[in-house]
């Protein structure tokens, strides 16, 4: 049986400006490269991805196209097809637009936040391979360090056992047919009763078992100025040894 193609959806359509810059955080630069570019390079370096669809807002399409063209990343780098697709107002809308843009009926789809710009390529491959081995939905996770409280307003309700908790990262991997079906049902349901905070929660709602694999501390999300300071410190000390693409 032939290998399923692997298509990555790279979410970069958000309007988040919590990093304090004038442009969406996906296009903020870290050591000379935008977060979206770093995430794209990690996908290419993983050696498991056949196509990358970058989800951008319509008003950022020209900016993204010029940036990635100048970097040589829109001309099938390393034999991987890379293209831009308009995202929606919410993350779920963007993912649905990306799923509709995939040409295949059967594939493995990886959904990744561009703000997780230091995600190791090996972790990307680990997620994709677990789906290829038969798991319909896979998420990378790391242990929770802090004690978590469930609250009602300002009152503590209970304290979940920290040993049972995990922080979830991306990329999350899925069988395309199952994820499409879950999205179709969600968007066709007038009141689904919840707002999915990630794609795995949508699959849980749809009744699909979600499998965990080991995540990586480097796959943290660059959201606030403090996150950016940490990312800058890491890349200042670690590059070019572990994050730069060989031969760059």
From Swiss-Prot:
Pathway: Isoprenoid biosynthesis; isopentenyl diphosphate biosynthesis via DXP pathway; isopentenyl diphosphate from 1-deoxy-D-xylulose 5-phosphate: step 2/6. It catalyses: 2-C-methyl-D-erythritol 4-phosphate + CTP + H(+) = 4-CDP-2-C-methyl-D-erythritol + diphosphate. The record marks 162, 221 as: Positions MEP for the nucleophilic attack. GO terms for biological process: isopentenyl diphosphate biosynthetic process, methylerythritol 4-phosphate pathway. Keywords: Isoprene biosynthesis, Nucleotidyltransferase, Transferase. Its EC number is 2.7.7.60. It is an enzyme of class 2 (transferase). InterPro entries: IspD (IPR001228), IspD/TarI (IPR034683), IspD/TarI_cytidylyltransf_bact (IPR050088), ISPD_synthase_CS (IPR018294), Nucleotide-diphossugar_trans (IPR029044). The record marks 18, 25 as: Transition state stabilizer. One of its GO terms (molecular function) is 2-C-methyl-D-erythritol 4-phosphate cytidylyltransferase activity. Signal peptide: none annotated. Disulfide bonds: none annotated. The keyword Nuclease does not apply. The keyword Nucleotidyltransferase applies. Catalyzes the formation of 4-diphosphocytidyl-2-C-methyl-D-erythritol from CTP and 2-C-methyl-D-erythritol 4-phosphate (MEP). Belongs to the IspD/TarI cytidylyltransferase family. IspD subfamily. This is 2-C-methyl-D-erythritol 4-phosphate cytidylyltransferase. The gene is ispD.
